[in-house]
Amino acid sequence: MTDLHTDVERYLRYLSVERQLSPITLLNYQRQLEAIIHFASENGLQSWQQCDVTMVRNFAVRSRRKGLGAASLALRLSALRSFFDWLVSQNELKANPAKGVSAPKAPRHLPKNIDVDDMNRLLDIDINDPLAVRDRAMLEVMYGAGLRLSELVGLDIKHLDLESGEVWVMGKGSKERRLPIGRNAVAWIEHWLDLRDLFGSEDDALFLSKLGKRISARNVQKRFAEWGIKQGLNNHVHPHKLRHSFATHMLESSGDLRGVQELLGHANLSTTQIYTHLDFQHLASVYDAAHPRAKRGK
């Protein structure tokens, strides 16, 4: 057994005896560290003292090339950093060579937006009871203002200014923003407020459950999914998809990335750029109409 294996065995015993980690967690550590042992041996290392940041980076690159996903690589590097930290604490290493090495961020999988025709079909629900009116109002507000789910369920009646067609929301980081919600949303909120007292609630919440309490995020998710099925949409409807659709449709219509950023409450423009995607056909038409080099010569 090489010094590489010996040190890993010692570390695993430490995790088992002193840290009292579960067998499954220990097995995960063992698998990750066996991968680096194999790589180090291939590169002629006899001890961990010979390992440097370049070797760790090469190990990360090799892992990615062999098909390891970004999230799995992050776990592998985390296990390696913990192991090297332990070696430093045992005076086996002077510094942790993996400390400055990080895995690439996992790609963000954005939900597909609902196109305008399907959105109109979703909103055209059969209003046959007060809860259906409530759901129509929630759908209109969510799509009309691009709210986060937490912002929707957190709305109180006092946050409304129906005369101006605006709503105040508390976003991430306790940041308030004032948003237009559109005349359709205003009309359906007014319709819902006429029925809201049927639930006999003294709660300040705008949207109530059938028990008269503030509606929960889970309940909203469930109701939106049910309406998607009832209205014959082919894809799963959830609150985040409505927010994404709002952003996409606004950006396609206006091209104003900064304006959409403000409406969504994003701190960084880069978040909006990732979150909203213009389809290539729309971009091409904008380019053809606006760019001087795209115009046909006379």
UniProtKB/Swiss-Prot annotation:
InterPro entries: CB, DNA_brk_join_enz, Integrase-like_cat_sf, Integrase_catalytic, Integrase_recombinase_N, Integrase_SAM-like_N, Recomb_XerC, Tyrosine_recombinase_XerC/XerD. The keyword DNA-binding applies. Belongs to the 'phage' integrase family. XerC subfamily. Its main location: cytoplasm. Residues 2-88 form the Core-binding (CB) domain. Residues 109-288 form the Tyr recombinase domain. One of its GO terms (cellular component) is cytoplasm. The active site is at residues 148, 172, 240, 243, 266, 275. It is found in: Cytoplasm. PROSITE patterns: CB (PS51900), TYR_RECOMBINASE (PS51898). This is Tyrosine recombinase XerC. PANTHER family: PHAGE INTEGRASE-RELATED, TYROSINE RECOMBINASE XERC. GO terms for biological process: cell division; chromosome segregation; DNA transposition. It comes from the Bacteria. GO terms for molecular function: DNA binding; tyrosine-based site-specific recombinase activity. Gene3D superfamilies: 1.10.150.130, Intergrase catalytic core. It holds the Pfam family Phage_integrase.
